[in-house]
Amino acid sequence: MSHTNKIAYVLNNDTEETASPSSVGCFDKKQLTKLLIHTLKELGYDSAANQLLLESGGYQNESNHIQTFFKLIKTGQFHLINWQIVCSLPLAHSSPLRSEWLQRLLIPTPTPATTSLFDHMLLQLQYLQQLMSSVNSSTCSDAEIATLRNYVEIMILVNRQIFLEFFHPVTNSASHKGPHTALPVLYLRKILKNFIEIWDSLLVSNDQFLNEENIFNPETTLRELSTYLTNPKLTAQLNLERDHLIDAISKYIDPNELVPKGRLLHLLKQAIKYQQSQDIFNIIDPDDDASFSSPPHRINLLQDNFSHDLTVTFQEWKTIQDTTDEIWFLTFSPNGKYLASATSESSRGYFITVYDVEQDFKIYKTCVSLSQSVLYLMFSPDSRYLVACPFSEDVTIYDMNATSLPDASATDSFLLYPSTRLSPMDSFKLDTTTYPDDTESSASSSSRPANANSNQSRVWCCDAFHTAERAGWMVVGSPDREAIVHSLTTKESLFSLKGRTCIALGHDENISGRKSIDPAKVLYKPTSSNGNWQYVEDDETFPRVHDVKISYDDKYVLLMTHQGVIDVYDFSGFPSKEELSKQTVDPKNFLIPRIARLDVGKNMTCISLPLNTTHQGFHRQQISESQHLVLVSLQDNELQMWDYKENILIQKYFGQKQQHFIIRSCFAYGNKLVMSGSEDGKIYIWDRIRGNLVSVLSGHSTVMSNSTKPMGKNCNVVASNPADKEMFASGGDDGKIKIWKISRN
């Protein structure tokens, strides 16, 4: 017997194999076999896959129903696709359709051979329309509606393909130049549009069965198909479009009935990413698949993949030094186009420099007419306006789209580039006498502004609302115990939190000794989380506000106070611009609930929210895993990460030096990193989740300027570019702005 035959004999007569269990460890043997067969076919080993199929007893990768359905698509026999075939597909995470629904959809109607495809699909649409008359969300479960919606989506995908194939006519005659425009237009209007309208009506809010990977937007789909009418050349090759249709429908199918495309490779990627995640020097970036797609890089599948090297590097890319004054504040615009810089007091005057990031950081605007040093800068969400909060009582606003006008008579002739001179478009002060809560008690020595001889409050911080409903609004905070909602467009103060707040308590919290508040007087939007809240009077003196942040969905306003706490207010019920314009709600007659208080207990210098990478105008996108995080810089050589909604301290970061000055920190690299300046001139970078220090950069050093004033070596501020996760900037006492780049090894 030859060696080969011996191997075959042993394999065929292995008693251990015949008596083998139905599982291998915790894995199902049938699933493993199906996965191997599927992968062999994807790799082109069809004969080996067929041999394994025979030896395993015929484990099919897809059921007969699925094979029949996909064959109809590949051969273009769409006139044979009906609700009976579609509803026979086994869907993932779905419940069976009601029997009475199936009876209405699966009406046996033999279609004559002469019936057109248009009439056939019109009949399927009519069956669905008849069914929808009995579908009611109040009597049907979300799971039932989700199943019906998935089948409707599959039928829409099929009809979309039918529509596209109008632009690939069968060339029965040489004179045929292309499709008649009337038929695609009619099909889109009479069939596809009605299918999509029904699908839209089946959407369930907060649907736990909604698969984000599979749904498509009806408005986008209609716009896309309408584009094909005007430019039919956009359609791809016929076979390629049918393959895409099969791939799209495959995502709806139960994986136990159809092995997902590339499943084994996907599992291997997950395993390698998990192995790499165990290394504390690995910066996890789920969006980065470069290591799996780079041809020169080969991953060894025969051993574990660990690396003890830092997976990202930080490189100093550019140094800007247009001043010898200390850099106090840096901020990128939301669209990443501008970088604004504010300096300390200067013998040349006070101004803000705005750099054009896209033009190699050339000076774009020099904002003038400031009477004192600027403590805080903020760009509006559309990146058009820059708001400056100086030491003085004036909040100054600049329009980045305005034309720069040199002024020979101006006192700021010291400017390096007079052609970039930009005057304010507006400025305002907070008048503390205009609010009714300035009672004798609130104006006592403990709460009176430090500049008590003035009726205006200083403004040291601000942040803008982000959604379209509150576009042009911002919250300004004052160390003189004020926080006010101000409109940039109408140039008026809309609401003062001082004296207009209450405290929200859970149903299990003790309210004894507290004065209850009628919920009708509270501005809040009822949800499942606040349905059991009780509201009590807030009898505390309004705090001194040193920093303010607004969540990207505009639901929460965070005030960092001088008292060592961060107060979180629920603004979800605050009226929109439309409601205020119609005067349906007067917010001055209501209270804003404080839903949380983060008891940090130490002196804080700034707070930061995660970066929002969507920057095209106004938006509602949330930031998934990190949407309720706030980073706190402490004057105690420490940073803290809190979940402000749950009032939980999540992580602490140590290493940087901060005891005497305001040092600012930020999120970076798609919110995977946390970074901060330091009083030793260095930049400290941590892994956001683990809290370990991953790098320390030598950023800024002690220098002596041309003046007699000695310069410190603080790195006062770091700022990330929200439109380019690989870019951040730092500013220090040496007057330098350094631009840094992050790259993966």
Curated annotation (Swiss-Prot):
Location(s), subcellular: Nucleus; Cytoplasm
Function statement: Component of the GID E3 ligase complex recruiting N termini and catalyzing ubiquitination of proteins targeted for degradation. GID E3 is regulated through assembly with interchangeable N-degron-binding substrate receptors induced by distinct environmental perturbations. Required for the adaptation to the presence of glucose in the growth medium; mediates in association with the substrate receptor VID24/GID4 the degradation of enzymes involved in gluconeogenesis when cells are shifted to glucose-containing medium.
Biological process annotations from GO: negative regulation of gluconeogenesis; proteasome-mediated ubiquitin-dependent protein catabolic process
Positions of the UniProt region annotated as Disordered: 433-454
Alphabetical UniProt keywords: Cytoplasm, Nucleus, Repeat, Ubl conjugation pathway, WD repeat
Name by which UniProt lists this protein: GID complex subunit 7
Organism: Saccharomyces cerevisiae (strain ATCC 204508 / S288c) (Baker's yeast)
Note: Present with 1200 molecules/cell in log phase SD medium.
Similarity comment text for this entry: Belongs to the GID7 family.
Origin superkingdom: Eukaryota
Pfam family, one: WD40
Quaternary structure (record): Identified in the GID/CTLH complex. In the absence of stress, the complex exists as an inactive anticipatory complex (GID(Ant)), composed of VID30/GID1, the E3 ubiquitin-ligase RMD5/GID2, VID28/GID5, GID8, and the RING-like subunit FYV10/GID9, awaiting a substrate receptor to form the active E3 ligase complex. When cells are shifted to glucose-containing medium, the substrate receptor VID24/GID4 is induced and becomes part of the complex, named GID(SR4).
Renumbered ranges of WD repeats: 322-365, 369-408, 445-487, 540-579, 613-652, 657-696, 710-745
Bias kind Low complexity: ranges: 441-454
InterPro entries associated with the record: WD40/YVTN_repeat-like_dom_sf, WD40_repeat_dom_sf, WD40_rpt, WD_repeat-ST_regulator
An annotated GO cellular component: GID complex
